[in-house]
Regions:
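An N-terminal, well-structured beta->alpha segment
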Residues: 1-37, 41-42, 122-147
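Short glycine-rich phosphate-binding loop at a beta-alpha junction
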Residues: 15-23, 47, 146-148, 249-255, ...
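N-terminal small/polar loop signature for handling phosphorylated ligands or for N-terminal nucleophile
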Residues: 17-81, 162-220
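Short glycine-centered, acidic/aromatic-flanked micro-motifs in structured strand/loop junctions
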Residues: 20-24, 149-151, 221, 305, ...
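Gly/Ser/Thr-rich loops at beta-strand to alpha-helix junctions
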Residues: 24-29, 77-78, 153-157, 214-215, ...
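Proline/glycine-rich low-complexity loops and linkers
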Residues: 40, 100-133, 137, 221-295, ...
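Gly/Ser/Thr-enriched, mixed-charge loops and adjacent short helices
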Residues: 82-202
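Phosphate-binding and adjacent anionic-ligand microenvironments
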Residues: 206, 243-420
Length: 420
């Protein structure tokens, strides 16, 4: 890591340069110049990848060319948000303790009211080629699919065309005209309506949607069905098991993954281990167990044989390879997953208390779990960033799910004082 003035950020012989990448937000170039200027104050060089993806920065950093990586992005958030994701020399996100130390050092510097240093940057065009070449080499091409791809007016606009062109796919592009302010705006993995409509209109084989920094991907089948991260985990997990490449026959998912995924994996002799929400926790469990596949319903999927983080482009090419090699359509493949009715309710609260101390809430949770048995799930947790209690229920019928989400949410409102 780099820190105080005079520090040199290298580990195990890594170079003395830091890689900087960004998505398409209008504030990106200014922030990149500020980061480079700050590094120059401690005699550390910077290489600028320009517009690239978060997993692209992670890959390039772990090749050993750089001491660390910095991705300037706010992922799926609106254009006016932005932030810094710092990647270690090994390609992983920083540990919480290291992030906290960096934040403390930044706070110390800001308290001194010193003038910031900007450093003009020139994009190194060779870096994207290294990343796209690597992705293309993880699969055996070509792909003869007709695809519709939504780049979310974000990072994928610079990377995806070269990759899918090399792999031979015919692509109709949407969400591929960034202007600095339209990243994630009614497009990308959080807004699948336009993608679904275009897939149906063009009779494409399937559609792919990335988010702003392309660390996640969601899909739309030829019939217009949304194919989420759960479905990808099932298809990839069962494919890896057939190839005898799934250690301990285990897939890592989160508490939000549908019970239908768990049942489908179990039918193939695969255990699903759940973690708290967040790709960070998924990765921690993967490393702990030596698992090679894990992810979230939201489309963050980690193939640890190839990447240290969720990678939307990698997920896309791996899914396409599975579909091609199966000789079936995506619709036919995902038909094996029977999702249980699921409902998520957010309850805005005035204050928090440990859920275990809320007697009436616990009583409702236990009653729901008794009624569902092994045919349902109850997940109640607080948001990590907002004053919300989240109630997620899965069960055999929509009627039962509605009943229990309503009862548990009402108990939370009574205990913690609902707002609004």
């Amino acid at each position: 890591m780099w820190a105080r003035q005079g520090a040199v950020p290298y580990q195990d012989g890594a170079g003395h340069e830091v890689l900087i990448g960004m998505d398409t937000r209008e504030s990106g170039p200014w922030l990149a110049a500020q980061v480079a200027g700050g590094l120059s104050r401690v005699h550390v060089g910077a290489r600028f990848a320009g517009i690239t993806t978060t997993p692209g920065v992670a890959y390039l950093t772990r090749t050993g060319l750089f001491a660390a990586g910095v991705m300037i992005s706010a992922s799926h958030n609106p254009y006016y948000d932005n932030g810094l994701k710092v990647i270690s020399q090994s390609g992983y996100k920083l540990a919480d303790a290291v992030e906290l130390e960096l934040e403390q050092l930044m706070a110390e510097w800001l308290s001194k009211n010193e003038e910031a240093t900007e450093k003009p940057l020139t994009v190194d065009r060779t870096l994207d080629h290294l990343y796209t070449n690597y992705l293309a080499e993880t699969v055996s091409g070509p792909f003869s699919f007709h695809l519709v791809i939504d780049c979310a007016n974000g990072s994928a606009t610079e990377i995806a065309p070269a990759l899918f062109g090399r792999l031979g796919a015919r692509v109709d592009w949407i969400g591929s005209a960034p202007d600095g302010r339209n990243i994630n705006l009614d497009c990308g993995s959080l807004h699948l309506e336009n993608l679904r409509q275009r897939v149906l209109e063009t009779r494409a084989d399937l559609g792919i949607a990335f988010d702003g920094d392309a660390d996640r991907a969601l899909f739309v089948s030829g019939s217009g069905k949304v194919v989420d991260g759960d479905a990808v985990l099932f298809l990839a997990g069962s494919s890896l098991k057939r190839a005898d490449k799934l250690p301990s026959n285990t897939v890592i998912a989160t508490v939000m993954s549908n019970l239908g995924l768990q049942k489908a994996l179990e039918a193939h002799g695969i255990e699903m281990v759940r973690t708290p929400v967040g790709d960070k926790y998924v990765l921690e469990e993967m490393l702990k167990r030596g698992a090679v596949l894990g992810g979230e319903q939201s489309g963050h999927v980690i193939f640890s044989e190839y990447a240290t983080t969720g990678d939307g482009l990698l997920t896309a090419v791996r899914l396409l390879e599975i579909v091609r090699d199966s000789g079936q359509t995506l619709d036919e493949l995902v038909d094996e997953i029977k999702n249980y009715p699921q409902k998520l309710v957010n309850v805005r609260v005035k204050h928090r208390r440990p859920l275990a101390e809320l007697d009436s809430v616990q009583a409702e949770i236990q009653a729901a779990e008794r009624e569902f048995g092994s045919s349902g799930r109850v997940v109640v947790r607080f948001s990590g960033t907002e004053p919300l209690a989240r109630v997620m229920i899965e069960g055999p019928t929509h009627q039962e799910v509605d009943k229990w989400t309503g009862r548990i949410a009402e108990a939370i409102r009574a205990e913690l004082g609902a707002v609004g």
